[in-house]
Design a protein with these regions (language model features):
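Acidic, S/T/G-rich, low-cysteine, solvent-exposed domains in lumenal/extracellular/periplasmic regions
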Residues: 1-176
């Protein structure tokens, strides 16, 4: 399909992390985010992209509600910024993302643009200028919300999260 000019949207999730598991009282609000082997690395490498087995954390992120007490019979919740839900920004005027506002991602991974000069690659959405990348496996805990984030560790910027790849693609099975 791709070799004959078909158009495909790939939504790749290289790391398993889940808020449902994180909210469980049985695991002390902690999970281990682990890498998934989707067996697609060769194909995407040939197309000029690498989906990294990591998580992008950003100080500019969406808040999550956290239960932090009770008021009588009412549960009291408060919103805390959750670095694992980064806001993504567009830095270009491509027709796909022109006039697009900030986009919220959940447990997003980074993408590297590599070699393969035959195809055109455009970063559609990227992280902010206050970003940190954590390789999988990594521990994720709601307890981190109790502390002020170490701002000096969020020293990366514009990490590609959404990429458009255009052109003519060769089969990953060619010459095999």
């Amino acid at each position: 399909y791709i070799m004959y000019g078909g158009k495909v949207i790939w939504l790749i999730d290289q790391v398993f992390a889940d808020m449902d598991s994180l909210n469980s009282k049985y695991n002390n609000n902690t999970i281990l985010a682990t890498a998934k082997d989707l067996n697609l690395d060769d194909q995407f490498f040939r197309y000029g992209v690498r989906f990294n087995k990591d998580l992008v954390l950003d100080l500019r992120s969406a808040p999550i509600p956290v239960v932090n007490g009770k008021y009588g019979t009412q549960v009291k919740t408060q919103l805390y910024p959750w670095p694992y839900f980064p806001f993504l920004f567009s830095k270009n005027d491509h027709p796909i993302n022109k006039n697009l506002d900030v986009v919220k991602a959940e447990f997003a991974g980074s993408i590297d643009l590599i070699g393969s000069g035959e195809v055109k690659k455009t970063v559609l959405l990227a992280s902010s200028d206050a970003t940190k990348v954590m390789k999988a496996p990594t521990r994720i805990s709601l307890n981190m919300l109790s502390f002020e984030p170490p701002v000096q560790q969020y020293n990366k910027s514009d990490i590609p999260i959404v990429v458009l790849v255009e052109g003519e693609f060769e089969s990953v099975y060619k010459n095999r």
